Structures are given as structure tokens and as C-alpha cells.
Amino acid sequence: MPKRDDIQTILVVGSGPIIIGQAAEFDYAGTQACLALKEEGYRVILVNSNPATIMTDKEIADKVYIEPLTHDFIARIIRKEQPDALLPTLGGQTGLNMAIQLHDSGVLEANNVKLLGTELESIQQAEDREMFRTLMNDLNVPVPESDIVNTVEQAFEFKEQVGYPLIVRPAFTMGGTGGGICHNDAELKEVVSNGLHYSPATQCLIEKSIAGYKEIEYEVMRDKNDNAIVVCNMENIDPVGIHTGDSIVVAPSQTLSDVEYQMLRDVSLKVIRALGIEGGCNVQLALDPHSLNYYIIEVNPRVSRSSALASKATGYPIAKLAAKIAVGLTLDEMLNPITGTSYAAFEPTLDYVISKIPRFPFDKFEKGERELGTQMKATGEVMAIGRTYEESLLKAIRSLEYGVHHLGLPNGESYELDYIKERIGHQDDERLFFIGEAIRRGTSLEELHNMTKIDYFFLNKFQNIIDIEHELKNHQGDLEYLKYAKDYGFSDKVIAHRWDMEEKDIYELRMSQNIKPVYKMVDTCAAEFESTTPYYYGTYEDENESIVTDKEKILVLGSGPIRIGQGVEFDYATVHAVWAIQNAGYEAIIVNNNPETVSTDFSISDKLYFEPLTEEDVMNIINLEQPKGVVVQFGGQTAINLADKLAQHGVKILGTSLEDLNRAEDRKEFEALLREISVPQPQGKTATSPKEALKNAREIGYPVVVRPSYVLGGRAMEIVDNDQELENYMTQAVKASPEHPVLVDRYLTGKEIEVDAISDGETVVIPGIMEHIERAGVHSGDSIAVYPPQTLTQDEINTLEDYTIKLAKGLNIKGLINIQFVIAHDGVYVLEVNPRSSRTVPFLSKITDIQMAQLAMRAIMGETLAEMGYKQGIQPYSEGVYVKAPVFSFNKLKNVDITLGPEMKSTGEVMGKDLTLEKALYKGLTGSGFEVKDHGTVLMTVSDKDKDEIVKIAHRLNEIGYKILATRGTAQKLKDHNIPVEVVGKIGGEDDLLTRIQNGEVQIVINTMTKGKEIERDGFQIRRTTVENGVPCLTSLDTASALTNVIESMTFTMRNV
């Protein structure tokens, strides 16, 4: 069938900021789709609010709008651009919900915009729980016993019929937002009221829990001629009851008989045909482990996290082909880009095993609720490929960067068996490692199966890993056992531990005996057809399929799984670096392990190695490829942390030298450099023990900022006000030692400024300076950043420029550098320097049209910035005002305090741009999910030190017409200044302020931290209540003041004459 010629211009809706449940997989899908549509000759217009994506680069679409993904803003773009069609199925849940809103409001019809891909009725039939259930009943496809409710009372009526446990699934949400498993009345009430709040349709499905069934997924494609195929089927190792995004997944499924596989395949294809889906679709099924009974759980009528995984697992580009199906092409006329010879209608076959393990944020949020259920909590994931299940699992484990390298915890032997079993009984993020620990202690697989309902197949594989450990222990130095352990994915580190040797001894032994991995190709067809893809994984077999060319090569280290503090911004820089390497005529090689990202799309680099980012795995690739050098500055802390280890093997680190990287990180050397170049920093000292930290803090004077050296995202960083708080920090948050010192710095309050620069060793180019709205003390990743700076004097700007050039030259930077400054009452101080790409690089690149990562890579390869046409110093400003606003995922993480401080907590970001600061801020806040209203009620409860400042904000909000509620102390302060205020009661008393929030009487809460950081504090309860009820809560008065500016600019003040 020829493609559609009745449309020329297509609007693609992206998925917006990265949140838990909707991450980089949509950047990958959206990028593929836009390029595929352009390839077919269509004009593509993209709208997305996330600047940290490749898809929002100018080259990806004909026109790119970085605007909030709300009905009003997209409607404006439709009226301006007059597209012929809208493609909503590549923007995650956000894209689908936007399509439904634009259709329901009549905007699509009024502007003659057609929907491409799956019909709206089909989307609604799959997403609306009631319609879906009806269709399944018509098809005789079993669904769990369930009911649709719009109120909490209806949920309790259903509970009377079927009893507990129950699963709650809100309609039209993703990542299980608002849902959960309920075992009693209190949980049912909380989860259903939450779910109704988060569902755009105020609708929840309540179903009888089938927790314990196997969870199986089929990733399917269908075109308009009813050709339908299964791209990949996947099995969750965790049974039904844990969200698939939080489950350990294996592909292809390992425990299904042929009868079961074909039965579920037939059902999946039957459902996708009945729904009339055109494009990609994900079908989730539950299978009774003891019979052929099954249920269908849900269908996602769009490209999803699972389809990104299926694409990387098989090499079959689902999003690209889904976009082409949407414009009328069919599976039997499109070639599979991997083989270049077989058609897309051939189902992929795999001759390897894929393991996916989620990456959770609990290393950041140690007090967070770790137990897993139907609401997703992982921020990212890793994937590994092996010839055996054990090999792929162990490779995935060491890709996580949790400090775990194997099936066990670092100090696992110190736990009591009772504690281990108790932890296995809770479904949490560490259960896999505790199972390994239990098997080591001799716990039977039967007992483990009864506790976890994990299939015996997987438990036997875990047992096999532990058996190999014992064999290694009993055969120290035996090469046969070394080879055997390598076949099953054991790392040198783990073997060394079993043999009481050093990791480097095992590495050298392997090299001397020629025990090295070979690299196999991922080709979608189990080597049946000739394949041309440069996509490889390592394994210990005989035949190497990765042919080394004689071209000069540069190897780029990716940034691994997405986590708080290291997001898609680093993938963005990695991809741009690769493009620059290719343009310079080198062969570009990527090593990465994240299945969601653009960098692991096989069409980006000349060669892709899907491998763990560890010293051993990277060295194996370097030994084969012999690159000219390795680039570490684009892969975040993951890559930087490998630089030292690789250099010890004689590998050339390209760009800023290892000595200079270490000088930026080492406290004493850095201080010496600052003295030499006359750049001031806040007074600070290094402590290697709690006693020394107390001595330092008293000398410097409180408040002080304390943190471990070498961290990204401000991990374990705190501002402390007295000896007691410092002692708590030193004993609970960190283990200080001479190898791991703790830094104690004077805490300066003032404006925080962030600068990114590029240097070639001679010239330092500064694309722009960003001013933070929140004062120093809030992590830069959680602050609202503004370009160009709005309140700096020319002298301050000149000083920032001067210090940036001195620092870049003093550290001999080749490539990128990111610097944070604070402007205190007595001048500019440097807070920290990162000699690498940063999370603001994509934002600044978009604003200034200076492709920073590409310029940096060109400088690393020896081009000068002068040759590229750049002059030293700050570059001319772009017109307009731009803000980068953080986006948080607190609604997915229970027990996490939302107060902003030096520890980073945001998962993503949006950009707002307009002619004035207030308009840009309005877009930034709106894009981040904050509904800015010109009237309403604000609740204020602030600490004593903030009471003077809150008076000004309250006065301005009162002038606009906002009603003010406040707790007693704050209210008294406002009354003293003649500001009308209503006093609300403390928690637990009469007229409880929490009840006011829960009843929807409050639109904004302003609450600042009172010290005494324990969870019991009232402030914590207030902040969590705002999250559970979807009320914006501001914990920084700077943000509150900025918001007040925005509201003032939208409205009029009312004053009597």
C-alpha cells in the first residue's frame, strides 16, 4: 500500500519531562518517529517541553516547539501551523491524553486535523477500564473479576463481594500512578481516593488480586491491512502484583511451554486486531503457573517502556516502523533496517537471553518506602545480553552501579538469616540480592518459591550461580573453573574475591591464558539472514563477529541507567559527541547499557557495544578495538569514575587529562590552584573522622555544608546548624575515613549562578550564564535557572567571566567545564567545578544555538575554537528569556520529604521561553505540572527565620485577592502587619490544617523547614499531604516570590482609593 498523500504536515506530540514511569524511552521513540516521517517526505512539527532531549533538536523535525504540553498551548500551535494530522502514540501517556483532550474540546475538528495511527475509539477502548472490560467479555478473553468505581463508597461495595487483596488501577494514567494493592479498609480508602484524584476521568478499576500469577508481556505490531506480528515476548521474574516497570524482566520468556506461548500469542494478536490498533502495542497477561488459565491485565495502545526494551532486545525498530504504519505503509512492504534484506513482517528470533533490571532511587531516598507494588518507583533501567540466563543476569546486576557486582549484598554475610527471610517476604528493590544470600545459607528453593512465587526455573538459575561460587572456592587458581565461571557471567572482581586475589591478578591471568570474550551481533533473526548491524554483546564463546576495521576509532562511554542526578542530559551530550567524531572522519564506538536511550539506538554510532560500564567490560572492548582514545566527559559520573582505572591500563583519556580531572576533585590541590589564580571560595576544611569534622565546623562557624568528596547530584549532602546535627550526619549519613574524607564548608547565603564553558586549552567560550531563582543551598538540579541573568550587575558578570576563564585555563580544560558560583554580600565565590558535561548543556545548547557537546568534542580532537569561529568570553545573548524548571516524581515515592536542599530530588526538567521573565516562568511552571491560578487560597506555615520575608509575599498575594490561611505563629506575624489572615489549627487539633488540604480548600502551600529533621515533624506531614492531594507546595521563599511575580503579571491588583 502506498503511503498517504492526503497529508503533508504532521504534528508529533512528545512526552514532556522525565518522571518515574515515563523516561528516556520516549525521547528514543520520538526521535525515531520524526526522522522516519521526514524520510517519507512529510513536514514534521514537534512539540515537547523537555529541552534535555535529542528529539527537540532542530535537525530532528522541520519545526520544533519547546512549549508546555497542555491543551491550551498545543491548541495555539495547531492554530498557528495548521497541520494536516496529529500523531499522538509516541508521546507516552501524555501524548495520548492530549489527543483525547484536543478531540473532546473540538480543536482537532475545527482545524481539520486528522489523528494518525491508532483510532481514537481504539485508544479509548484500551485506556477506559469499563470499555476495555466490555470488549474482552465480547471476545471471551478472561479479565480478573473487577468493578469500575468513581467514588470510594463504590469501592467498598465491591470489596464486600470479593474480599481482599484488591488491586486498584486508575484510568488514563501511566506507571500505575495513584494505584496500588490493598489488604485492608484503611489502604483501600487511601489508594482509591488517590487514584480518583490522579485519573483524568476520575475512574478506577478495582479488581480481585491475582498476585502470584506469572506476568507475561507481548510486544505486537499491526498495520491497516491487518498484518500483525509479535516482535518480542517477555517474562517478568516477579509475579503479578509488581509493576512491570519495577520488575526484573527476561526476554524471550523462559518458562512457557510451546502450548502456553502460542496460546498467549494468539490472544495478544486477537486483542490487537479487535482494538484495530495500527502501530505498536503492548499486551500484559497473567498466567496461572499450575494450569492453562490466564487473564489479560491491560493493553497499552502506544509505544511504551516495554517497546523500547523490545526494540533494543531484538534490534527491531518498533517506533520507526510504527510511525510509518501510521502514514499507511504496511509491514510486508517495509524492509527491516537491521538486516536490510528481510521484511518487517518477519517476526524476530533471538539466540541469546536479555535481562532488564530496574534502577531505583533509594540510594538517594534512604527513608523512602521501598516496598514494590502496582505503582512504579524505578527511575530507569539497565539491560544486559548473554548466551545463558545466568550470564545476562549477572551482567545486568553489575550495570546497576549500586555498589553490587553479584547476586548478593556487599556486607551480606553480616545479616541474620531471620532478617534475610523477613526482607525476602517484603517485595522490595533488594529482594533479588537477599534471595542469593538465603541460598548461600542453605535455604531450600521450595521455601523461597512459597515466599516469593518466583518460578523454580529462575530459582534454580540463582542456585546455579551460588553453586559455581562454591566450586570456585574449592578450586582456587584452576583455569578450567575460571573459564566455566566466565561462561556464566562471573566478573573478575567476584572470582578474585573467591580466590583471595586482586581483580587485576585475575585480569592478568586471563590475558596471559587468552581467556577473552568474543562479541556477537544482535541481528533480529538468530543469524538466519545476513545482517549489517553494528550492534554487539560480549560472551565467552569461540567465534567473534565484531570485525575490527583499520579506521582510527574513538570510544565514548555512555552514562548508564537514568537516576536522580544523572538523567537524559548526559545521553544527549553522548549522542552529540558521537556525531562530531563521525564528522571528523573517525569511527565512533559507544559503550552503554541503558535500553531507553537514543545513544543505544544502533543507527547512531558506527558500533554499539551493549555492555556493563565497568573496568573489566570496557577493557575487554578496548583490547579488541584498540581505539585512539576514550572520551569520559559526556557520560556523567559513571564515565568519570572509570577514567582512573582505564588510565592504569595505559588507555589514553581524551580531553582534559586525568591529573587535571583529579585536581578539580581533590580538595587540597583545588585549593592550591584557586590561591594561584586568585579565585575565592567559601572557607572549608576536610575531615576524616567525626571528631575532626566538629573541630572544623567550630573554626569555620555554623551553618556549614557537609558532603562526601566525589559525588554527583549532591548525594548525602546537608546544611547543618549545630554540633548535634553534625554528629548525627557524621554517624548516620557517611562513613568518613582517610580514603573517603568529608568536606566541611562555610554555608554562604546568596545568589547561585551556574556557568558552562568550552575550552580548547587556549580559548574559553562561555555560551551563557544562568542565574538560579532559589538562593544557594538548593541543589542546582532542583533550582529554577534563568537565562540571561536578570539581577546581576555588569561588574558581577565581568567577574564571573574572568573567574570562568581563569578556572578553565588553570585546570587545562579540553572540552567542557561546569562551574557553580555564589554571589554573597562581599563578592563572587566559586562553589564547585565539574570538569565534564553537565545537566545544563542541552538547555544552553537549545537557547544559544551553540552545539556545546559537539564543539567540545571537536576541541578534544584538536580543532581550535578560533578556527570554528568563536571568540573568547561570554557569547552574545539570545533574545527573550528562558527558564529551566525542575520536575519531581514525589507522588510515586512515599515517605520522601519534598523539602528542597543540597540533595537533588528532581527526575526531569522543562523549559519555558518567552519575551519576559514572568511569561517564561509561567510556561516553566505550567510545563512542570503546576497549575498557576489568579485567585484562590494559600496556606502559609514558615519557620521563625523566614517570618519577616513571608510578610512581603503575603502582602502581595493579598493585593491580588488571594485568601490567606496560616498557622498560629505565622498568622500572628501577618496580623502585626495588618494583613488579613485566617488562623488554622495544628495537626491533630480542631480545624486541622491537613483536613483543609485534603478537602481541596487550599490551592498553594508555602512551608519552610523547621530543624529537627525527623519524619515525625509536623512539617513533613504537611508536605506529604500536599503531594498525596496534588496541591503545589513551595519549600523555598524564592520560588514563592517568583510565583507571586507570575500571578501579578497575569492579573490586576485591587486597591481602594
Swiss-Prot record:
SUPFAM superfamilies: Carbamoyl phosphate synthetase, large subunit connection domain, Glutathione synthetase ATP-binding domain-like, Methylglyoxal synthase-like, PreATP-grasp domain. GO terms for molecular function: ATP binding; carbamoyl-phosphate synthase (ammonia) activity; carbamoyl-phosphate synthase (glutamine-hydrolyzing) activity; metal ion binding. Keywords: Amino-acid biosynthesis, Arginine biosynthesis, ATP-binding, Ligase, Magnesium, Manganese, Metal-binding, Nucleotide-binding, Pyrimidine biosynthesis, Repeat. ATP 2 binds at R707, R746, L748, E752, G777, V778, H779, S780, Q820, E832. Mn(2+) 1 binds at Q284, E298. Mg(2+) 2 binds at E298, N300. Residues 547-929 are annotated as: Carbamoyl phosphate synthetic domain. Residues 133-327, 671-861 form the ATP-grasp domain. Mg(2+) 3 binds at Q820, E832. PANTHER family: CARBAMOYL-PHOSPHATE SYNTHASE [AMMONIA], MITOCHONDRIAL, CARBAMOYLTRANSFERASE FAMILY MEMBER. Large subunit of the glutamine-dependent carbamoyl phosphate synthetase (CPSase). CPSase catalyzes the formation of carbamoyl phosphate from the ammonia moiety of glutamine, carbonate, and phosphate donated by ATP, constituting the first step of 2 biosynthetic pathways, one leading to arginine and/or urea and the other to pyrimidine nucleotides. This is Carbamoyl phosphate synthase large chain.
